[in-house]
Every structure is written in structure tokens, then in C-alpha cells.
Amino acid sequence: MQVKKLGYILFVGVIATICILPVAVMPWQTEKAVGNEQLASFPELRKEDGSFNTGILNEFSDYFADHFGFRHEMITLNDQLTGTMLKTLDSSSVLLGKDDWLFYKSTLADYTGAELFTARQSYAAAHVLGLMQEYCEENGIGFCFTIAPNKNSLYGSQMPARYTAASVRNAQLLQQQMEQQNVRYVDLFKTLSDHEEQLYYRRDSHWNMRGAQLAAQTLLKELKGSEAEFDSCINGKTSPHTGDLYEMVYPAGNETEQDTAYDFTYRYDEKFHSADDITIHTENSAADGSIFVYRDSFGINLHPFLAQSYGNACFSRNMPYRLTAVTEEQPDVLLVELVERNLNWLLERAPEMPAPERTAVPAADTGTSAKAQRKDGRMEGTFCLTGDLSGQRVDDDSPIYILAETGTYEASPCGEGIQPFTAYLPQNVREQQLKAAFLSDGEWVFCALDD
């Protein structure tokens, strides 16, 4: 009887310890974010205005969920068990593929073709790039756009068999429109897919250094007209790399992948901290020319090769793209690199540049109106006009003009809404009556814009 009672006590003690220990160690544990997550802060009893924080219990619940003891170890153990036993992961962000390859779940829509661009969206995304190209060329700057392929666009053979790859994807639809609208584009899909060497990390969403090297060589052949040689920069060593996807599902793990190491001769400016900096400036006295690159996280591995190839280079993660920042630098060329899974950003985040002036068009009045907003802009001497023509019959391949009393301007066909537009207009037209003109069944028509 005593032995049985002792067994109960030990069992209860073990369970109690398991429950209490994660709470008990919280004051001494510094929790780090997993992947790109934002950890909840400790809640305040009162708000900034001095009133009682009625949401304190919910906020504390979020804080506890993000900071309890041994959180990383528990997440890692859980995903190791589910991955081994069920061949899946208990993760909203990461997908387990074959041979322990990891993929972003956010790329599934691209991979399966579940959210294909409409004809209008394909035209609009390419047209935004065309307007950026026009602005650059008018300011004596070359322009080029490229797409960093999703990992499963190149390594679909490592995806779970339950997902079927689409025959057409948004990148292809956009590429067709860019060709029709004469947007300068470098196709990295063909270059990378034709290469037998593994060019992406198994447990990361990005290309490895060899993949970045091949991408850079393809870009530089177009941008500088000559083959770039980087094999001489390889130092014969390897560097360990911990994948971003691996850290999300196995935050307490310590496995790495070996990556090719290079020795470059370019130099960062004194403001440089890391490859994640919003803006990076480099110099290389042994190279010529200058480049401005709008990039995303794929630029972490890509930028060293471009920095090595140009006398002066600027790399920026700012989004929306600020074209006025480019003209301030006055580079030889602007390169825009965007990962495949974020191509929708071209439809949602309008580039910051003055709306180009256009010749007035004879347009018939539809007798209708559309909602628009006039907001302050960051560019000196301009304001930002945004709106949505979703109630109008706009042709798929129609530009959008803004008719002011003193001029006609073209808006970027992107922003918020189903049929959005954004235009940075001169301040002197802010108080004028504005209209939106567009093609409808091949004919120019206009509607009033109501604030």
C-alpha cells in the first residue's frame, strides 16, 4: 500500500514539475524569436493615456505563450516527432518535403497555381515595372528586373507527392506581359533549372552561395555585356549555414549545411552592420561602373558578387521602391530583384516616383464616380492620390490617366483594392477637380474622383 501511495506521489510530483518548471525558469530565460516571428512584450497595467488596460489578460496570455521556459526545446521535440512519425510538421509556415527538405508553405499557391494572376493583374504588374523603367531611362539610368525563383519551382521533385505542380505560374504570366511591354528582364528560372549542381539550401528558402554566383553571372552578362568570373574568389574552405526554415521548426537544433566560402576585395562603408541592413553601400577600386539594387532576402547571398563587379554599389531593402532615392545616387543601372512568392507586391505597393505627364486624351464621360484619397507624400512638391476603379469597366490592358485641370498624368495601376491606382502628383493640382480616364471596350472614358 505504501509503495502504491509513493508511486502516486512520484507521478503527481513529476507532472507538477513538468507544469511548473517552464514557468519557474521564465525570469532567467531570454527568449529569442523563431524565424520572423514577433515576440509579445510584457503587458502594461495602464495605457499611455493613463486608463486601465482592459486587454491585459489577453496580452499576458500572448506573452506567456511566447516566453515560457524551454519553449524552443519543446517546439523542436514536437516537430522532430511529427516529422519522423507522421512525415509532416506542426508548423503554419514550413512544409516537410522528401529527404528532409524544407519549403515555405507560402509558396504553395505559386507551386499549385491556386492564385493565378488575372489578365488585368498580369498587365498591371508588368506596367508598374514599365513605368519604373521609363522614369529611370528619362533620368539617364538603365533598368532591369529579375525574379528569384521559389525553391520548389526548381526542386519540385523534393515536394510531397500530394501537391501537383501547376503548368502555368504567375512568374510566367508576368514574363509574357513584360515581353509585350518591353520591360528589360533577366530570366533566372532557365539558368538555375538547367544546372545540375544543388543551388538552394535543403533547409533554407534561399539559394546558396553557388546559386547566388550563377544568378549574378547571368545578371552581369546582361548588365555589363561580359562574362563574370568568380571561381578565383573561392578560397577552398566551407562555411556553416543554419537555414531559416530549419530555425523555425527546430529552434533548439544545431544542424548546419556547408556552403562555399569566398574571398572578395570590395569594401563596405563605415555604416555597415550586417547583410540585413536596410541600405548597404560598397566600393571596389578594381571594378568600374555603378549599380543600385532593390533587393529582398535573396540579396544576402547575391550582393557580394555584384559588389565585387562594380566600382560603387548601393543595395536597398526599402519597399515600396523609392525611385527618387535612385536618382539621388545616379547609378548606371537600377536592378530590381524580387522573389517569386512576393510578385503580388508589384500590385499592392506602388513605387514612389512622380507620375509621368501624358498627352490629353479625348474621353467620354461615364457619368459615374470612384472613390479616391489625397494624402501627403514623402517626395517634395508632390501629394499622393490613391483610389479604386473596381466599379468601372476597365479593359485588361488599359493604363489609368489622371485628368487634372492643368495637365494629364499616368497613375501606377497598383495599390489597395480590386482595380487600384496610385499617382504622385504636383502639389499645384491638389485642390483641382480630378478625373480618372481609362480604356473601356477600346474607347477612352472617364469618371469623376470623389474624396
Describe these PLM feature segments.
Residues 1-451:
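Extracellular glycan-modifying ectodomains
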